Amino acid sequence: DIRTPMNAIVGFSELLEKNLQNEKKAKEYLGKIQSSSNLLLRIINQVLEMARIESGTAVLQLKAEDMDALFHRVHTVFEEDIRKKNLQYYADLDIRHHYVVCDQTKLQEIMLNIISNAIKYTPEGHSIYVEIHEAASENPSKIHYIFSCEDTGIGMSEEYLPHVYEEFSREHTSTENKVPGTGLGLSIIKSMIELMGGSIQVESRQGIGTKFTIDLSFDIALKEEVYGSE
């Protein structure tokens, strides 16, 4: 959702304006603005990729990436939205292999979309728990990650769950008009995950919350492949 990094840019720009005399805070806010701006650019580029996914011409742009850095960038984008809604937000990265070969843009968009949905549909003061943990892999050159996002939001009805990945599908609830969105996100995200050879599952109960779980496998990379020789 383009609004997510835009909200972060606007929010941190306002904080920067109020703290121009504080060099440490100003530098911190500038870094967050830059990070959110880069993510916004990637999302705009992803809009073009959406057409490729639907036409069957999408390909993975693979290179070595640092999962710690990617995880941090994603969460930075949501800091302002989390603060405004006073959400209890927990993020846990529990992995042994931190460098993998992946399509950074698509993987980042998957995380952004899932977490953004949780924030949208979780009322003020409620909680969201995001985790990436490493699971056993039979192939020593590959790593298996499980990404999960669980919220205590409004949830979805049992009748709607089979349709959650359909294009333009949004459940007709009393909150629908209050929450922006096109209904395209999850359909595209599922296509991206399947392009990577992974899977996505959803569990939800109306009035209790929703949990998305994503399984993905990647080739293991070395730190030198990400940052070069230091």
Identify the residue ranges that each predicted region occupies.
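Conserved catalytic submotifs in the C-terminal HATPase_c
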Residues: 61-66, 83, 88-98, 133-135
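Helix-loop junction within the histidine kinase core
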Residues: 51-62
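Short acidic helix/loop segment immediately C-terminal to the autophosphorylated histidine
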Residues: 17-24
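Short helix N-cap motif at coil->helix boundaries in the Bergerat
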Residues: 67, 155-163
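Short alpha-helical segment of the dimerization/phosphotransfer core of two-component systems
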Residues: 35-40
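Short alpha-helical Gxxx[C/S/T] motif in the catalytic ATP-binding
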Residues: 180, 185, 189
